[in-house]
Amino acid sequence: MQVLQGAEARAALTRTFSQIPVPDAVLSRIEQTFGERLTPEQVVERILLDVRARGDDALRDWTERLDGPRPAELEVPAAELEAAQVAPELHAAIRLAAERVRAFYRQQPAHGFLEHGPDGALGQLVRPLGRVGVYVPGGLAPLISTLMHTAVPAQVAGVPDIVVTTPPGKDGQVHPAILVAARELGLSRVFKVGGAQAIAALAYGTASVPAVDKIAGPGNLFVVIAKRLVYGQTGIESLPGPTETLVVADDSASPRYVAADLLAQAEHNGAEPVLVSVSRELLLAVQAELNEQLENLPEPNRSWARDSVGARMKVVLADSLDEALDLANLYAPEHLCLLTRDPWSLLGQVRRAGGVFVGEASMEALGDYVAGPSHVMPTGGTARFMSPVNVRDFQNIISVVGVNEETLRRIGPAAATLARAEGLEAHARAVESRLK
């Protein structure tokens, strides 16, 4: 285990904001699928253009080519949605998670204001978006939590129309847990479409899939590229990349808990776990725990986690907790876990993070599911300037200007002066026409 310190640690935790590396396996699959060497961007551009031109037919073709059987119908029938069942324990967990996420976001201030005073009326109107598309990744398992952690804030924001897209399984069907979660949230439109083709459908619309005002939800490299390319045609909430967790720990932390929290994220494909501690003894103890816990993980989780730990994990020895928090802010992690003797005393020093998990009872894995805040958080250092999914992501703010004539006469001449300074004579004359 290489332990970084000082300038070496700062250099390792400074983001370069380079493109996400493309694994050789992805490039090989692209060549097998398309019969030529293409970049992921070229693949996505081809899919977007095709869906925009051919609509539902293109969706069926790409789904058959990339995901499995050709879908006869793109939308999950209402009867299938109503009939979906899961084990009672899972259904109860879905219900609890939805309730807690909804309760959390109902506390977020999301109202406008309109002040009537001597100047007239000035204010802001807050209006929900008309239609939102929620993308739920498929892949190896149904990401039930992503649906709840994305759709519920949109519902609390007042969005009247929410549609869901998710890749079908190899049997051509949407996993029943996704359908149960959608039903629990009162969502009635779920489409069996994934990948870049789903993003294209939500952005441009097809005969079956309605175009939306904003697309929300994480996805693989192709989904992220597609969201970036359709931005402007529709809105996007973020461009989430591989997950990351930075743990700040002192000598009071349990090596078992620290290792468990690091591995909880390391089992995600491409994850980057980071440990910053003021105790060399803890670092050594965590290394031993990581080895033991890795061996006890089932496959394929063990291989995924071992890859993340071996290829991307960073271990830092800080001189003080102040330095540890400074390094955390430099890194701007998606998840920041504080496992120290007095974690609440450090909260005031946190300036850049998607989410902060305070104390050993508040493990990040809890936040992934039932704590309350959305787990869709900024990655890749974008927590410097972006926020987790929240109610404001699904609302418009409209400025209201309603000054009276007395105020116009007082401030209008200044407006005309500024307009002429900018070379905009018609602006100045529009103001002066009301002053005569």
From Swiss-Prot:
Pfam families: Histidinol_dh. NAD(+) binds at residues 135, 197, 220. It catalyses: L-histidinol + 2 NAD(+) + H2O = L-histidine + 2 NADH + 3 H(+). One of its GO terms (cellular component) is cytoplasm. Pathway: Amino-acid biosynthesis; L-histidine biosynthesis; L-histidine from 5-phospho-alpha-D-ribose 1-diphosphate: step 9/9. CDD domains: Histidinol_dh. GO terms for molecular function: histidinol dehydrogenase activity; NAD binding; zinc ion binding. InterPro entries: Ald_DH/histidinol_DH (IPR016161), Histidinol_DH_CS (IPR001692), Histidinol_DH_monofunct (IPR022695), Hstdl_DH (IPR012131). Catalyzes the sequential NAD-dependent oxidations of L-histidinol to L-histidinaldehyde and then to L-histidine. This is Histidinol dehydrogenase.
